[in-house]
Structures are given as structure tokens and as C-alpha cells.
Amino acid sequence: MTRRCDITGKSVLSGNNVSHANNKSRRRFLPNLQDSALQSDALGHSVKLRVTPRGLATIEQKGGLDAFLLDTPNRKLTDEARTLKRRVAKAAARREAKSA
């Protein structure tokens, strides 16, 4: 499982620990990933994603998972999010056709 946010795409960075004597040793900066189940209104069930707190805040700001996915261009989404976006769009179109 990759250490990458499914929404924002944030991943592991590398750098140095620098001591007071200016000795440098390599280290990794890991993203703060949280396993979360987000409710999708179009799909009718929750979807499990690995998301950073910043990604969760972005989803909430946009008005939920479905609104975030449909509003965000594909070039800004990760592969997992693009797959989920297609599923949400299909389910929303199916629901729209059913109500019409």
C-alpha cells in the first residue's frame, strides 16, 4: 500500500536531519494519512480512502465527496480518485435517468 493521499496526492518526501553541529543524516517525511470511510450519496454507501486531514477539509469545503470529485478536474486527481469519480458520475446519471 503506497503512502499517498487518495485525494490530494501528497506522498513521502525526503530530506535531512541537521544537528547543531551541522551534521546531516537522511530522513523521510511521511504524510499524515488517515484511513477514513467517506459517505457517497450517489453510490449510496461509504467508500474507504486513505486521506490526509487537509484532503478531508477540502472535501468538506466542497460539500461532500461526490461534489468534490465531480467539481475537480481529472488532471488534479489521483488514479483511485478518477476511478471513484467515474463510478459516482455513472451512478448520478443512472439516478437522474431513473427520476426523469
From Swiss-Prot:
Q: Does the keyword rRNA processing apply?
A: no
A single GO BP: translation
| Keyword Ribosomal protein among record annotations | yes
Sorted alphabetically, which SUPFAM superfamilies does this protein's record hold?
A: L28p-like
Pfam families of this UniProt entry? Ribosomal_L28
For this protein, the record's InterPro entries field holds: Ribosomal_bL28, Ribosomal_bL28/bL31-like_sf, Ribosomal_bL28_bact-type, Ribosomal_bL28_sf
Question: Which residue stretches belong to region Disordered?
Answer: 1-25
Instruction: Name the residue ranges with Polar residues bias.
Output: 11-22
In which domain of life is the source organism classified?
Bacteria
* Cellular component annotations (GO), alphabetically ordered: ribonucleoprotein complex; ribosome
Could you tell me one molecular function GO term of this UniProt entry?
structural constituent of ribosome
Q: Where is the signal peptide?
A: none
Alphabetic keyword roster: Ribonucleoprotein, Ribosomal protein
Q: Which family does it belong to?
A: Belongs to the bacterial ribosomal protein bL28 family.
The name under which this protein is listed is: Large ribosomal subunit protein bL28
